[in-house]
Swiss-Prot record:
Source species of the chain: Mycoplasmopsis pulmonis (strain UAB CTIP)
Identification of the protein by name: Large ribosomal subunit protein uL3
The protein's assembly and partners: Part of the 50S ribosomal subunit. Forms a cluster with proteins L14 and L19.
Keywords: Ribonucleoprotein, Ribosomal protein, RNA-binding, rRNA-binding
Coiled-coil segments: none
Region Disordered: start-end pairs: 124-149
Pfam family, one: Ribosomal_L3
GO molecular-function term, one example from the UniProt record: rRNA binding
InterPro entries linked to this entry: Ribosomal_uL3, Ribosomal_uL3_bac/org-type, Ribosomal_uL3_CS, Transl_B-barrel_sf
Length: 266
């Protein structure tokens, strides 16, 4: 098992080399500090405690300061344990390079809070009939239905009722890693990730052990920009360039047409 902590930046879309649009979530994954190493002998299970982003000095407590001092660091804002993760020493850094494009990961975060909501929105209950008296004060169409049998004189625990919607821990499984950028501390995963922008997330190796697939080949923006520039130049010489041509082929055709035009001018 392996994992890392990060912050959700937002969603965007990128293109594969064959023109397919891929919706991706961009996650900022700064180097995590290993603030504790848990072992079977001492703790009863194996795990590594990862921590991210320094706390304000005014919010640091003495027990935290002592705990993080063992790892030669300061108290952090976001701290999580990753079970069965091994191979890292106390105080070492974990970066985004532990994942490779084509892998599948599970991403856990706190979903967006939506405040108080009724049962229609919160639990997808059916709206009542709007005809034959429905919709009035005696038969409101969005009111909660029966809460159970007449006997018992209580509401059974877990009954679907109005209440706070969202702001709970959610895990999205089997998201494909599209790209990792160690230099800029960026991880791109295919699809949506729970939580608002700037929300903390935990990225872990997928629990269902889905084998990695071949990494998606992304379009090279430098090559596309260069080809677009050559297409614009080719219009001056009435050359029909094709997109599947290489840059060298395009440049040679343009150079040949340029020489022919200069020869006619002389």
């Amino acid at each position: 098992m392996k994992g890392i902590l990060g912050r959700k930046v937002g969603m965007t879309q990128i293109f594969s080399d064959n023109g397919i649009v891929i919706p991706v979530t961009l996650i900022e994954v700064k180097p995590n500090i290993v603030s504790n190493v848990l072992t079977d002998e001492k703790n009863g299970y194996k795990a590594i405690q990862l921590s991210l982003e320094d706390k304000k000095k005014s919010r640091q407590r003495k027990p935290e300061i002592g705990h993080f001092a063992k790892a030669n660091t300061t108290p952090k804002r976001f701290v999580k344990e990753i079970r069965d993760m091994q191979g890292f020493e106390l105080g070492s850094n974990v970066d985004v390079s532990i994942f490779t494009p084509g892998e599948f990961v599970d991403v856990t975060g706190i979903s967006k809070g939506k405040g108080f909501a009724g049962t229609i929105k919160r639990h997808n209950q059916k709206i009542g009939p709007k005809s034959h008296g429905g919709g009035g004060g005696s038969k409101p169409v969005r009111q909660t239905g029966s809460l159970g049998d007449i006997s018992g004189n209580k509401v059974v625990k877990g009954m679907t009722m109005p209440g706070h919607l969202g702001h709970e821990q959610v895990t999205i499984q089997n998201l494909e890693v599209i790209m990792t950028d160690v230099k800029n501390n960026i991880l791109l995963v295919k699809g949506a990730v729970p939580g608002p922008k700037k929300g903390f997330v935990v990225i872990k190796e997928c629990a269902k052990k889905i084998p990695s697939k071949e990494a998606v080949k992304l379009v090279d923006l430098e090559i596309v920009a260069k080809k677009n520039h050559l297409f614009e130049i080719s219009k001056k010489y009435n050359i029909n360039l094709k997109n599947d041509m290489s840059i060298e082929e395009m440049e040679s055709l343009i150079e040949k047409a340029k020489e022919e035009q200069e020869g006619k001018g002389e």
